[in-house]
């Protein structure tokens, strides 16, 4: 199963009890996967999904939340599109559902972005809207240089609305047009993990992070193989190990970290191959390498103490045999 399929399978199983969140998810799914059609003078809603479980989830929600009947039509894959597609269609009361979900405004005009009730919703409903958009037209690529979480959008207004929703969750995303198709893209690895966690794809996050770390370690090992100087190899491995420990320290401490230690830790994470002296030069104001080392040491000590108090794995637990082979 691909990463995208795994994420959608997990998201389609997320239990949501809050009615407003279920409405936000349905609205977003219909907006990003669907369309309004006029057939024999009646408005018909269709939403095309690539996962059968997502189609069933949408059908159940339409029935339970709005009381409307829908059908699922299976469209077999062809030369251009491999794999089956699942079309959820609402024929009877299509106009009523379109108004209820915000696809049509009070004057009966199609809404081009996201419905107002979704745009101004609570954080929980905003998360639900993102989940619906991803189930509709989302994808996740393997960790690497071009790794990204993307959602294909029906238009620029919907893309900007989704970017705004991500911003409300503290996640940076970008709207861009590629070959005439509007997309919302998240490229930062930590941001990808954050949005997946928010949406409820916890198992997928673990799998993605494992592949991401494996790739980083492999990439570092490849670079180390080209080093002629043994001391340089040891320094680089030590820097990678320190970066891994700092990342674990931030997970343990969460918000409870003094600013000057946060800054030192971020410098280490953002410059994994840099020496302590180089990190000191990158600091504002500049620091000596001993000052940088001292701050990172205090950060790790704080995290290890808290981990010991809580009975959870400390910063050294994240180290792999490759990192320890100094």
From Swiss-Prot:
Pfam assignment, any one: WhiA_N
Entry annotated with the keyword rRNA processing: no
Sorted UniProt keywords: Cell cycle, Cell division, DNA-binding
Keyword Transferase belongs to the record: no
GO MF annotations in UniProt: DNA binding
Disulfide bonds: none
A GO BP entry: regulation of sporulation
DNA-binding region in chain numbering: 275-308
Family recorded in the similarity comment: Belongs to the WhiA family.
General function of this protein: Involved in cell division and chromosome segregation.
Name by which UniProt lists this protein: Probable cell division protein WhiA
């Amino acid at each position: 199963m691909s990463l995208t399929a795994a994420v959608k399978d997990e998201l389609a199983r997320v239990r949501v009890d809050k009615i407003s969140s279920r409405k936000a998810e349905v609205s977003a799914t219909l907006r990003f996967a669907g369309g309004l059609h006029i057939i024999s003078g009646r408005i018909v809603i269709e939403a095309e999904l690539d996962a059968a479980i997502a189609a069933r989830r949408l059908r159940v929600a339409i029935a339970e939340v709005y009381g409307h009947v829908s059908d699922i039509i299976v469209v077999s894959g062809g030369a251009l599109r491999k794999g089956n597609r699942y079309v959820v269609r609402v024929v009877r009361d299509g106009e009523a559902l379109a108004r209820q979900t915000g696809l049509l405004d009070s004057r009966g005009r199609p809404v081009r972005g996201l419905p107002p009730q979704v745009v101004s919703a609570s954080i929980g409903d905003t998360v639900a809207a993102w989940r619906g958009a991803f189930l509709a037209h989302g994808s996740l690529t393997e960790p690497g240089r071009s790794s990204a979480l993307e959602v294909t959008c029906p238009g620029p207004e919907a893309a900007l609305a989704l970017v705004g929703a991500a911003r409300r969750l503290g996640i940076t995303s970008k709207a861009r047009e590629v070959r005439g198709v509007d997309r919302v893209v998240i490229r930062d690895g930590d941001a990808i993990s954050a949005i997946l966690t928010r949406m409820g794809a916890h198992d997928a996050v673990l799998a993605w992070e494992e592949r991401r770390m494996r790739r980083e370690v492999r990439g570092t090992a490849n670079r180390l193989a080209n080093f002629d100087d043994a001391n340089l190899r040891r320094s680089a491995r030590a820097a990678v190990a320190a970066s891994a420990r700092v990342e674990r320290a931030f997970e343990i401490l969460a918000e409870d970290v003094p600013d000057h230690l946060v800054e030192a830790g971020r410098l280490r994470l953002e410059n994994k191959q840099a020496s302590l002296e180089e990190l000191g030069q990158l600091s504002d104001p500049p620091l000596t390498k001993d000052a940088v080392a001292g701050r990172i040491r205090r950060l790790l000590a704080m995290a290890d103490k808290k981990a010991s108090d809580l009975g959870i794995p400390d910063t050294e637990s994240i180290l792999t045999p490759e990192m320890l082979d100094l």
